[in-house]
Design a protein with these regions (language model features):
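Alpha-helical subdomain
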Residues: 1-114
Length: 114
């Protein structure tokens, strides 16, 4: 989870704590950039390697990455979704962070991206 200090984030954290699910490290890495740096720091590169990480909110992934062959359009046709703004707000508080150790600048995944 990210953005625990905005109004919606505080409400989410409080609701989880009331259910006994305290997010112990949430304030140590509260932003996309902090999550990306955390991943890069965890990936200990050896000589000749490069740590690469990328982080996106789930809302960003839905809006910009889930377009292959009309997948987003197909999903949206399955059920009328009248609460998109609330859903987008919720999804903007979750992220996916991907990291890899690249062997060289010529690595086939040198342009690592989500």
């Amino acid at each position: 989870m990210i953005s625990p200090d905005d109004q919606f984030g505080r409400m989410m954290v409080e609701n989880l704590e009331q259910r006994g699910c305290e997010l112990l490290g949430i304030h140590a890495h509260p932003t996309l950039e902090a999550q990306k740096k955390r991943m890069e720091d965890l990936l200990v590169a050896k000589e000749g390697q490069q740590a690469k990480a990328e982080s996106l909110t789930m809302c960003d992934i839905y809006q910009s990455k889930l377009d292959g062959e009309g997948e987003r359009t197909r999903i949206e046709k399955l059920e009328l979704f009248d609460e998109f703004e609330e859903w987008a707000l919720l999804q903007s508080h979750y992220c996916l962070t991907l990291g890899a150790l690249l062997q060289s600048a010529d690595s086939p995944i040198k342009d690592l991206a989500i």
